[in-house]
């Protein structure tokens, strides 16, 4: 699991002023990680901090879709702080994505709530396809707690496979936490070098 720190300007980057914190998780050992699209918008730089304390720079964005709020980023193996690595520990994606989820299934949300570090919460699926205005795909709704900073974390099934990406909650409800299906990542082309964070942020501003 990753704590994702983003920087809105080069000046903030140079001064070490973090603009926002979010979560992300590796899906390949060579550094591809999933997060929310909204977690990287308006940023020109970002870093990934692991539970070991090692910090790695985000190199590029290889896939993003604001409509479904998912992005795949590439993280360097060369550390800014700590130890370089040859590979990252990663999560498996459920082969069917959300296809096998059923209401009442046990799930686990892992992320970086409030920037405090790795945390895990358990809950059940309360809806497998909840329509939410801001998302182009129906969301998974569960009772697994998430907080600010958890955006971009993983929602796992009982086999430890990622089925969705935690993204938000109904403010005026209780235990109504939302995650966007990870299914689009299964079919996305993740082979390219990708674009810089600043280029993607500019494109998202134009699209808005």
Predicted feature residues:
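Gly/Ser-enriched beta-turn/beta-hairpin loop segments
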Residues: 9-17, 63-68, 78-85, 127-141, ...
